[in-house]
Every structure is written in C-alpha cells, then in structure tokens.
C-alpha cells in the first residue's frame, strides 16, 4: 500500500487519480499507523511552507518522515519541505536534503514559474530508477515560486532564468519539483517507476 500524506497542503485528488490509473493500492492519511503499514510514501503539496510545516509538526509527521527508511517521493511543495529551510516565511523545514529554497526574481521573469519545462539529467544520474523509460529532455509541468539549489543530491535540473533542482534524491528520499500527476504520459511513467522501486518491480497489478 502507498500512503499519500494528507497535511492540508496536498494536491490529493490529482495524485490519487494517478494512482487509480496505475491500479495502485493507496490510502490518503495523516495517521502514523497507516504510514507504518505502508510500503512507500507519496508526499504531495501545494501552498505555503509555513502552515504546511505547522501541520506536519502538529501531527508528529515531521519526526516520522525524518526517520523513515521507506521509499518516499515528495512532489512540488513536498519536495521543497525535504530541504533544510526556505526563504518563504522564512522557516526551517525537514532537513533531509541540504540547501535552502529561494524565490525566483520577479524582476527577471514571471513568478510563479508555470507551465511545461524541459528536465535535463545530471551527468552520472542517467540510470536513476525514477528515470527509467523517460527520454532525455522530457517536458514536465511546473507551478512554483520557490526553487531548490543544484547540489550533489540533484538528479536532474530545469532552467528558468537559471538552473534549479528538478529531481533530487538521497538514500530512500526522492523529490520532484514538477507535478508528475499533471505531466501526461511522462509523469505517469515517473510515478510507475516509483511504484516499481517500492515493490522491486514485483507489483501484483499490471499497468
């Protein structure tokens, strides 16, 4: 079972619709017992980092996420909250990935960054499991005002005035800045890859 974390900041409907299309067993939840039972975690999100972190701390989800060894995929705000801090607020975030989120400069481009953008894989990251059957230079759908820095944990980048982290990974934690659930076949393939990673390619349903 995949647990989709509900912390009152998630794009839950579109993510759950994607899970339905992929015939995946899932549960939308903020209960520790469900997270403990889950095989993998999807951490979606849209909105503001400060109330999102407040909700995570209220439910004790922050400490659970920091210590879990289950495969976890953060989406959009969910990925951003995996970092150490953000200038949105500002506020400290989960500290799983190193780096601080910054806001795009509205004097250089429109903010938020909204629409389709090419994602370029970092050298040496071509075989990451999330990228299986996704060609180089694939476009994904973005909607965000803040961006993560390019670090040693960056799997792929996108560019909006300057490069930023589009896919990140560290141990069992993965994050995508874009919305795979709104990115057509390519996004569905990425979510399929996450499910295959969770279940070792041995899922009981076909897609």
Region spans (language model):
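Short acidic low-complexity segments
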Residues: 1, 27-37
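N-terminal beta1-alpha1 ligand-phosphate binding loop
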Residues: 2-24, 180-182
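Structural motif
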Residues: 42-44
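Amide-donor transfer/coupling interface in amidating biosynthetic enzymes
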Residues: 67, 101-207
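Short, well-ordered alpha-helix to beta-strand connector turns
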Residues: 38-39, 69, 98, 138
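Structural alpha-helical scaffold elements that stabilize or flank donor/cofactor-binding regions
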Residues: 34-35, 64, 167
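Cysteine-nucleophile active-site neighborhood
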Residues: 47-116
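Short, flexible loop segments at the rims of nucleotide/cofactor-binding pockets, characterized by
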Residues: 18-25, 49-54, 118-120
